Structure formats: C-alpha cells, structure tokens
Amino acid sequence: MSYNVRVAIIGGTGLYSLEGMELIEEIFPDTPWGKPSDKIKIGKYKGKLIAFLPRHGIGHFLSPPEVPNHANICALKQLGVEEIVAFSSVGSLREEIKPLDFVLPSQIIDRTRFRNSTYFGNGVVAHAPFAEPFSPNLSKRIAQTAKKIGLEIHLDKTLVCMEGPLFSTKAESHLYRSWGADIINMTVLPEAKLAREAEIAYQMICMSTDYDCWREGEESVTVEMVIANLTKNAETAKKLLSELIHVLGNGDDLSLKNSTRYSIITAPEKRNPETVKKLRVLFPEYF
C-alpha cells in the first residue's frame, strides 16, 4: 500500500461512514489474517489524510466475536497508521454515567472467552506490556478537545469487555459493578491488544446508550434502545471529531515505537518460519 496515513477512525455500531470526508480511494486488502471488516476508506477530512474502517461492516453484518480484528489492525498498520480513535456504544454500570453521555475509559477488564487476542504464538512468543491499555497522550488530547467544544466527558473509567453477542444477565451486571467497572461493551478487545502489539496508539471514545440491566425499575438494554440513543449522539460525535482531527496524526505520541521488538522472547533459530512470514508483514524491521 502506497499511502502514509497516520490516523485511523474505527466506527462502531451506528457509525458506518464519516460525513464530510473527501474520498480518495477505497481499499479491501488481503492480509496474512484475511480481509478487514469492510473496505477501508482513505480520504481527506478537514484537510487531513485519514483512514476510516467500520468495525462491523457497512450494514452491520459482523457480530462482536466475528470482527476480524487481526486483519483490521494489520491493514491499518500497513497504511502507516500511528494513532487509532475508535468509537463504541457502551452500557453504563454507574448512575452518574447517563444514556447519551460520552466516556473515555483508561482501564479494561477482559471477560471475553473465545477470541484470539495476539499476533504471536505458534512458534514466536512475545509478551507486550498492557498495564495502560489506552494511550494517555491521545486520551488527554481528546479530553482537551471535548472541553474546548463544551462537551462533558467522563474520564478515567474502567471498561469491561464481555464476549457477547447476548447482553449481560443481571447477576453479571451486578458482579461487574462490584469489581469497579463503570461501562461495558463487546468490542474493545482484542482490538486494543492488537493495536498495542502493532505499536499503534489507541483510544476508544465510548457513547453510553443504556444502563445495561442492573438498575431496578429501568428497562433492560435492547438493540432498539442502543440504536435510538446512538442516533441522538451522532451529531455530538461529529462535532467532537471535526475538532479532534486537528490534533491527531501530528507525531505527538510515538511512545510505542519499537516496543514490540523488546517483547519478543523466542530465540531466532527457534522461530516458526510460517509465523515469521506472517509477522514480517507487520514488523518487517524485526523479522
């Protein structure tokens, strides 16, 4: 791929395109992990070259466990992406996080069960640090932009990622609250883990659509409820992104550069050649 796109936007439920983007090209590349969720749009947005990828595909035909995260992140890495801003709907586990509120999580609890969450294994072992799953630098820029446009946004919250595609039971919802989780979704993992291994700064912007099912007297979450509130939030998300784009992709967060090089532990002579061949697409300088 001949583009040098530094910024990627991953759209979640209800965000399948980016209004105002001047399209240059659509690509649907092959990667060693298959094809991405859908065609990646490359274009200018507010004068900046970006890539846009709908996580669930246009028309929402991929459930959370089916999203080809490995291919998605690999394809964006090949474009030159250094920063990813991902959007997602979430359920609120806290009274103060109301439906339609925006949230910037800083921590994740992994409750997925059947998802491969690494590019490594099968003869090449690596252990990437993940204590801070999101980019503090990127999060700070998003928070500052939200303040600039007068958008109240909840900061430093804990996001629990469940397997899905079914929503939580009441017992699970109360359990997550007791653990200190503030919001819940089905898509931050393994997306965030793979972005970390690929040395891409990553932050998810969460939009609360419901109170999950823990709140007494409140209707339990439904798809209709999620979509209705996402539609209401669309204009706010566009307003935030139209300002945020100016502080993205300017080389402000290169803290992950070369980090994976020092996470690989397998001796060169013991590495599986087939795995090395795949990893070379992501890390040509390491293999």
From Swiss-Prot:
GO terms for biological process: L-methionine salvage from methylthioadenosine; purine ribonucleoside salvage. Its EC number is 2.4.2.28. One of its GO terms (molecular function) is S-methyl-5-thioadenosine phosphorylase activity. Pathway: Amino-acid biosynthesis; L-methionine biosynthesis via salvage pathway; S-methyl-5-thio-alpha-D-ribose 1-phosphate from S-methyl-5'-thioadenosine (phosphorylase route): step 1/1. It is an enzyme of class 2 (transferase). It comes from Leptospira interrogans serogroup Icterohaemorrhagiae serovar copenhageni (strain Fiocruz L1-130). InterPro entries: MTAP, Nucleoside_phosphorylase_d, Nucleoside_phosphorylase_sf, Purine_phosphorylase-2_CS. CDD domains: MTAP_SsMTAPII_like_MTIP. Keywords: Glycosyltransferase, Purine salvage, Transferase. This is S-methyl-5'-thioadenosine phosphorylase. It holds the Pfam family PNP_UDP_1. Homohexamer. Dimer of a homotrimer. Catalyzes the reversible phosphorylation of S-methyl-5'-thioadenosine (MTA) to adenine and 5-methylthioribose-1-phosphate. Involved in the breakdown of MTA, a major by-product of polyamine biosynthesis. Responsible for the first step in the methionine salvage pathway after MTA has been generated from S-adenosylmethionine. Has broad substrate specificity with 6-aminopurine nucleosides as preferred substrates. Belongs to the PNP/MTAP phosphorylase family. MTAP subfamily. Substrate binds at residues 186, 210-212. One of its GO terms (cellular component) is cytosol. The lineage of its organism: Bacteria, Pseudomonadati, Spirochaetota, Spirochaetia, Leptospirales. The record marks 168, 223 as: Important for substrate specificity. Phosphate binds at residues 13, 55-56, 187. It catalyses: S-methyl-5'-thioadenosine + phosphate = 5-(methylsulfanyl)-alpha-D-ribose 1-phosphate + adenine. Disulfide bonds: none annotated. It comes from the Bacteria.
